[in-house]
From Swiss-Prot:
GO terms for molecular function: structural molecule activity. Gene3D superfamilies: Major capsid L1 (late) superfamily, Papillomavirus. Pfam families: Late_protein_L1. Keywords: Capsid protein, Disulfide bond, Host nucleus, Host-virus interaction, Late protein, T=7 icosahedral capsid protein, Viral attachment to host cell, Viral penetration into host cytoplasm, Virion, Virus endocytosis by host, Virus entry into host cell. Forms an icosahedral capsid with a T=7 symmetry and a 50 nm diameter. The capsid is composed of 72 pentamers linked to each other by disulfide bonds and associated with L2 proteins. Binds to heparan sulfate proteoglycans on cell surface of basal layer keratinocytes to provide initial virion attachment. This binding mediates a conformational change in the virus capsid that facilitates efficient infection. The virion enters the host cell via endocytosis. During virus trafficking, L1 protein dissociates from the viral DNA and the genomic DNA is released to the host nucleus. SUPFAM superfamilies: Group I dsDNA viruses. This is Major capsid protein L1. Self-assembles into homopentamers. The capsid has an icosahedral symmetry and consists of 72 capsomers, with each capsomer being a pentamer of L1. Interacts with the minor capsid protein L2; this interaction is necessary for viral genome encapsidation. Interacts with protein E2; this interaction enhances E2-dependent replication and transcription activation. Belongs to the papillomaviridae L1 protein family. It comes from Human papillomavirus 19. InterPro entries: Capsid_L1_Papillomavir, Capsid_L1_sf_Papillomavir, dsDNA_vir_gr_I_capsid. It is found in: Virion; Host nucleus. GO terms for cellular component: host cell nucleus; T=7 icosahedral viral capsid.
Length: 546
């Protein structure tokens, strides 16, 4: 409420016996309260919880480890899974350069390390965690451009430079191939990468959608798993549900869902576990311009609007003697993209990346001793063509070539190697720190086994030998629950690095790069190798006396 002052002007008339009229002016002032027209923003009644950065409660040590994987190889068909004749057994998996490779790196528990110098931390008051400081994703195989396509691709003709008008027919599909959009990307985090795609949505209950109408679509967030297809130029869409003609895209995605990382969601995550940092490089251009075949679902606005009251303002109808009058083409235009030049000058892989400050509150701390590395790289997208003589005769004795006697096979290979620089960090077991971690994920405290363990009432327990026999009592109906993996229903490329850690950083390529890049030197203190700043041995330069 705001006060409002109102002034009232009242004229008064008075006369005497001599009929002289006097005019008196009265000005009255009064104040009233009126509702405020603007909005008033009040502070919240309770304080808002503040999420702390890991740098505020994680203490970093000067102990670094180098972790590395084996050479990771995979071989398969670039377009689809190959099953046996009965279709009951998968014989050859789908391995494409346009797939996401999601590595789940398992790290050892640092709290179970037998450290030579036990003064590094106090197990009664602290817990150890890993901090990621550097990573290098190695890629083998030469650079190459792969092609995708469909033997029955839905295209009527070229719409960029047509030489004759071509309408639609019953079946206009052609055998078309093209190279996909060029994509290099990797995302590092201690939780799986969050992806997004467009999918078929449920219509409202009161809506009566006729058969053949376009369904509503919605944006879906889901975890990017190993083997999920990336965007190759046709968008992040559930093609299996939204393209029922099975001919609008290439074979490798016609029955798949293409996902794209939801960078907006991960950047605004309050904890930032899904993405510490990422690197991305995409490029494409439109190479060919085609038009779809089939009946157009959304006609060009013309006389069908308002019972013919609206004129056609998009084109002038052709003459009835022209082909365009009886067989008008549709307006479903689309391009086929191309990734263009593949060069070693623009490679994100086979080079180190150092993490100084993450984009979120988690500055590289690997909760649950694991790290997720999501990779896409189709710059090494060569597909091998393997031909086999089917009749078994000696190839040197074949006189006339007959293509029916040779079977052609396609194979694609992937080669990876991952190296890490891990920093040993410690977290004090203080009340405010534990409250912060418990609000973030209470399973972390269970992993640290911080619960109170009461003393046993009776040190002697009964143990039956044949507990499942009919002669003994029934076993316990409520056995102790095993630890449940939150990602057990998701598919990742699991890489165990529990026994692949080393303190000898100077013995590995990434370790030497880290020492030289940071200007550090390695020393051994009480049997534990530590890292310290490099001190220059050069003396002070003296001025020359005149």
């Amino acid at each position: 409420m705001t006060p409002v002052v109102i002034f009232t002007y009242i004229p008064a008339f008075a006369s005497d016996s001599n009929e002289n009229v006097n005019i008196y002016n009265f000005l009255l002032q009064m104040a009233v309260w009126q509702a405020a027209s603007g909005k008033v923003y009040l502070p919240p009644s309770t304080p808002v919880a503040r999420v702390q950065s890991t740098d505020e409660y994680v203490q970093r040590t000067n102990i670094y480890y180098h972790a590395y994987s084996d050479r990771l190889l995979t071989v398969g068909h670039p377009y689809f899974n190959v099953y046996n004749v009965a279709g009951s057994k998968l014989e050859i998996p789908k391995v494409s350069g346009n797939q996401h490779r999601v590595f789940r790196l398992k790290l050892p528990d640092p709290n179970r390390f037998a450290l030579a110098d036990m003064s590094v931390y106090n197990p009664d008051k602290e817990r150890l965690v890993w901090g990621c400081r550097g990573i290098e994703i190695g890629r083998g195989q030469p650079l190459g451009v792969g092609s995708v396509g469909h033997p029955l691709f839905n295209k009527v003709g070229d719409t960029e430079n047509p030489n004759s008008y071509k309408g639609t027919s019953t079946d206009d599909r052609q055998n078309v191939s093209f190279d996909p959009k060029q994509l290099q990307m990797f995302i590092i985090g201690c939780a799986p990468c969050i992806g997004e795609h467009w999918d078929k949505a449920l219509p409202c209950a009161e809506q009566d959608i006729p058969q053949g109408s376009c369904p509503p679509i919605e944006l879906i967030n889901s975890v990017i798993e190993d083997g999920d297809m990336a965007d190759i130029g046709y968008g992040n869409l559930n093609f299996k549900a939204l393209q029922q003609n099975r001919s609008d895209v290439s074979l490798d995605i016609v029955n798949e869902t293409c996902k794209y990382p939801d960078f907006l969601k991960m950047q605004n995550d309050v904890y930032g576990d899904s993405c510490f940092f990422y690197a991305r490089r995409e490029q494409c251009y439109a190479r060919h311009f085609f038009v779809r075949g089939g009946k157009t679902g959304d006609d060009i606005p013309a006389g069908q609007i308002d019972e013919g009251s609206m004129k056609n303002t998009y084109y002038i109808p052709p003459n009835n003697s022209q082909q365009q009058y009886t067989n008008l083409g549709n307006a479903m235009y689309f391009p086929t993209v191309s990734g263009s030049l593949v060069s070693s000058d623009a490679q994100l892989f086979n080079r180190p990346f150092w993490l100084q400050r993450a984009q979120g509150h988690n500055n590289g701390i690997c909760w649950f001793n694991q790290l997720f590395v999501t990779v896409v790289d189709n710059t090494r997208n060569t597909n091998f063509s393997i031909s086999v003589n089917s009749d078994g005769t000696d190839v040197a004795k074949i006189a006339d070539y007959n293509s029916a006697n040779f079977k052609e096979y396609l194979r694609h290979v992937e080669e990876y190697e991952i190296s890490l620089i891990l920093q040993l960090c410690k977290i004090p077991l203080k009340a405010e720190v534990l409250a912060q971690i418990n609000a973030m994920n209470s399973n972390i405290l269970e992993e640290w086994q911080l619960g109170f363990v009461p003393a046993p009432d009776n040190p002697i327990q009964d143990t039956y030998r044949y507990i499942d026999s009919l002669a003994t009592r029934c076993p316990d109906k409520n056995p102790p629950k095993e630890k449940v993996d939150p990602y057990k229903n998701l598919h990742f490329w699991n890489v165990d690095l529990s026994e692949r850690l080393s303190l000898d950083l100077d013995q590995y390529a990434l370790g030497r790069k880290f020492l030289f890049q940071a200007g550090l030197q390695q020393a051994t203190v009480n049997g534990t190798k530590t890292i310290s700043s490099r001190v220059s041995s050069r003396g002070t330069k003296r001025k020359r006396k005149n």
